Amino acid sequence: MSNKDDLETAVITEATPIREDENCEPVKNFESVDQSAKSESKSEPVASTRKRPESKPSSDLETEVLPVQASQAAGKETVSKDVPQSGWGYWGSWGKSLLSSASATVATVGQGISNVIEKAETSLGIPSPSEISTEVQYATGETSAKENGNSSPMSGPFGVFSTISTAVQSTGKSVISGGLDALEFIGKKTMDVIAEGDPGFKRTKGLMNRTSTLSQVLREAKEKEELWTSNEVTMETDKKTHYGLLFDEFQGLSHLEALEMLSRESEIKVKSILNSLSGEELETLKLELEQLKEAFSLAELCEEEEEEKKGGEDFTKEITELFSQLHVSSKPEKLARARNTAYEWIRTSLAKPLKEKEEGEKQLEAENTEQINNKSIEDIHAFAIRSLAELTACSIELFHKTAALVLHGRKQEVTTIERSRALCQMTVLLCKELSCLSKEFTTCLTTAGVKEKADVLNPLITAVFLEASNSASYIQDAFQLLLPVLEISFIENKTELPEA
């Protein structure tokens, strides 16, 4: 019996490492040994079971004596050697070795990164993750110790880095927005500077900002009249009674715009000179300009407006004398000619009805005279509006030429105050002449329209007085535009006198 027990233990010790190597053939041998042990045969089955382990290589026998850990490692090596170099076994072992090497590499790299981060934290003075976590817990009132233990040591530095990146991002946004605002401000200032240097754009911007000028009002009235008359069938006949169209036809609007430009330029020059002076020089110049403005007033207009003129020769003589006091090369011949033409037409229109009444013609001839009178009412009204527009346009043209000659003429032979007084008297004379001319036209209308109804005659008379009043206001506005021209002429003349 002892021999059998020894044989069984020997077989079991030999088969044990083979089962750990997951080999199928030794298991079969173990089963055969058990069956032989159970049988009552004495020694023949044992000899057959011992032959098979002897065929194993010497390396497998040596592993049986090693400890359990060494036997497991050696068993793994024998399996890798005994398995044929094909199938899933080969690829599985290769994948395991690859994963093990990759995990080792990752661990090494992670350890190196953690070392670098720790060095960066110490050099930059960044607190450790544990300190940051304790501060956060103290601030938020967290008391969980497990969360503190499980928190990764990399979260602290990355949290600091994320905070820094957020700050940089917000700073970048503010810098970009501030830069855009600065560019917008610079662009606006640049456009303002360009606009100041561009006379065309500057003039347009000035016209948009400032109140409407006289020329603009007249041009708008002209455009409205053109639109209104364009819808009428009898445009040629209606055009004769529109003041704005007639005023532009006689070049009055063009001369008024040119006079406004000269006045605006002179006003800018005067302001710049006043800004450059200071002290006693500034006060002295202001007092002299105030005296010039007082001499430039139209106070005499109300006093002399009631006086009546007797004939055209007096007007022509007076306007010529006043113009000679300005000492300019231009003469008021065109203005006097327009005025004389209007009075001659009035005389001829009033003479026809008187002659017809004196002759005492028959009833048929009286009917013809009624038709003539009816036509003469329309003609008188149309010619009255035309004469007022022509006389006003000639007056503004005279002021424009005077301003140009004063600015660009040679040395003055007369003082600026004397010129201002002469221009003031000239303006008063022109306004009075317009009033007298309108009265002459209304008298002519009343005489020619004796048999007409009041509804037909009164609107014509009212229109003549209205246009005469408008003409006088246009002349007064043009006269006021001459004040800056005389002021800059006075300043230039004052600076030239000491040099002479």
Curated annotation (Swiss-Prot):
Question: What is the top-level taxon of the source organism?
Answer: Eukaryota
> Which InterPro entries does the record cross-reference, listed alphabetically?
DUF719 (IPR007998)
Keywords, alphabetical: Phosphoprotein
Q: Region (Disordered) spans which residues?
A: 1-82
Q: Where are the transmembrane segments?
A: none
Q: Which residues carry this modification: Phosphoserine?
A: 93, 152, 215
Q: Which family does it belong to?
A: Belongs to the FAM114 family.
Q: What is this protein called?
A: Protein FAM114A2
Task: Tell me which species this is from.
Answer: Bos taurus
Gene encoding it?
A: FAM114A1
